[in-house]
C-alpha cells in the first residue's frame, strides 16, 4: 500500500485530478490530519512537494517511526529548515532558462546505474531544474549528481531500518501547474518502480 501526503493546495488538487497518475498511490493523506491515519497500513509513504514545514516538524516522530519500522519514505522537493534528520540540504540558484540558451546545458550525471529505477527513468526525465542539492550520507546510493559531487536524488538504506528516498525534483508541483513536460515521464517511472517493488 502506498500513501501520499498532501497540503490540499490547488496545484496538489489538480495533480490528484489527473487520472493517469492514480496508480501511483492507494490513499491520499492530509498532513493536517496525519494523526488520524494508521501509517502502519502502508509500505510506502510519499511526501509530495511543498508541504508545510511546521506540519512536517509536528509529525517528524511519526515519519521516523514509520521508516524505522522497515518501511519506505519518499521525500520530494526542498528539505528546508532541517526538518528531517540525516538530510544535508543546500539551496542553490535556480537556472530556469538553460534550455533556451545556445549550447545551454544543466550538467548532471546518473550514478549507480544498476539501480532498478533506471529501468523506468532516463536522465532526460530528471533534467529540468533544481532548487538545491543534498550531501548523500555515507553508504547511501546517489542516483543523480551535479558536478560538485552533491546529489539531486539518493536512496538511503543505511541510516534507518527502512529506506529513505530523497530527491530535489518536484514533479507533482509542475504537473499540477501544467508545465515542465519531463515531470510526467519521471513520475510515471517512479510509480512503475514502486509498483514493481511492491510486487516482489
Provide a role label for each language-model segment.
Residues 29-34, 58, 149-152:
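Alpha-helical scaffolding within the catalytic cores
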Residues 54-125:
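A glycine-rich, often tryptophan-bearing local segment used as a flexible ligand/cofactor-contacting loop or short
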Residues 4-10, 31-32, 47-51, 76-79, ...:
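Structural motif
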Residues 16-18, 60-67, 132, 187, ...:
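Short amphipathic alpha-helical segments and helix-helix/interface helices
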Residues 13-19, 104-179, 183, 198:
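Catalytic beta-strand/loop cores that center a nucleophilic Ser/Cys/Thr
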Residues 22-27, 49-53, 142-145:
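Short, flexible loop segments at the rims of nucleotide/cofactor-binding pockets, characterized by
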Residues 1-44, 189-200:
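Aromatic-Pro/Gly-enriched surface loop or interdomain linker
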Amino acid at each position: 500500500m502506498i500513501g501520499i501526503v498532501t497540503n490540499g493546495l490547488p496545484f496538489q488538487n489538480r495533480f490528484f485530478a489527473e487520472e493517469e497518475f492514480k496508480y501511483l498511490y492507494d490513499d491520499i493523506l492530509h498532513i493536517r490530519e496525519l494523526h488520524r491515519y494508521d501509517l502502519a497500513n502502508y509500505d510506502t509513504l510519499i511526501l509530495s512537494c511543498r508541504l508545510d514545514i511546521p506540519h512536517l516538524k509536528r509529525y517528524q516522530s511519526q515519519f521516523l517511526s514509520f521508516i524505522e519500522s522497515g518501511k519506505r519514505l519518499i521525500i520530494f522537493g526542498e528539505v528546508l529548515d532541517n526538518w528531517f534528520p540525516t538530510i544535508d540540504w543546500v539551496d542553490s540558484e535556480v537556472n530556469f532558462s538553460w534550455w533556451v540558451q545556445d549550447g545551454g546545458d544543466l550538467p548532471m550525471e546518473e550514478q549507480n546505474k544498476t539501480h532498478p529505477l533506471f529501468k523506468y527513468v532516463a536522465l532526460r526525465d530528471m533534467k529540468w531544474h533544481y532548487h538545491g542539492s543534498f550531501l548523500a550520507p555515507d553508504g547511501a546510493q546517489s542516483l543523480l549528481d551535479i558536478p560538485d559531487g552533491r546529489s539531486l536524488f539518493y536512496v538511503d538504506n543505511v541510516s534507518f531500518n527502512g529506506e529513505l528516498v530523497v530527491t530535489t525534483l518536484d514533479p507533482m508541483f509542475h504537473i499540477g501547474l501544467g508545465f515542465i513536460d519531463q515531470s510526467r515521464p519521471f513520475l510515471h517511472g517512479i510509480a512503475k518502480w514502486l509498483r514493481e517493488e511492491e510486487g516482489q
